[in-house]
Amino acid sequence: MSKKEIAKRYVLFIISLFFSALGVAFTKHGELGVSPISSVANVLSCTKGGFSLGVWLIIWNCVLILGQIIILRKKFQLIQLLQIPLSFLFGYFTDFGLWLVGFIPVESYIMRLVMVVVGIVILGFGVSLSVSANVIMNSGEAFVKAIADTANKNFGNVKIAFDVSCVVLALILSLLMFDFTIVGTREGTVISALCTGLAVKLFQRLTNEPVNRLVSV
């Protein structure tokens, strides 16, 4: 790839981060839970006077990056350290997205479900763009890949186990922090887990070819 194409792909990846973060913001605003990978940060952000969701996402992503370094050791590629500034950018985009959608009323349950569905669609679009960019993995996917490669396991199976582990950890944190009450992890989390992958596949079919043509020009 030429330097120009590489630059275009990184710009595309940053754009994908914005849409992914906006999708998270929509689901968060719906108050029915967020995607599994964001569920731990979401629970931690529910504490009064604590950090915002964006800040907790930065911290969570940095923990996952550290996990990659520990698992891969000498096999960890230095280029993957770019995940750190990109994690900060994702956290900022998430808080900005929450500000953007903050005016939308969510009093009714139907409206909350709508927010979750819209969030999943936007998140799916963002993830599909990041796949098309093909420059660097987000910290969650990279962490799963590190485990799968090291343990010689199927990526999809490890991803499912990782998502389930995130939800279980979020539930445990919620019970411990909020007097045995489940906070921040609800049916929206399950819906996101089941439907985000489908949205990504749909957008991949629609956008992969034109996006690749665009960045290759």
Could you say what each language-model-derived stretch is?
Residues 1-217:
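Core subunits and conserved enzymes of cellular information-processing
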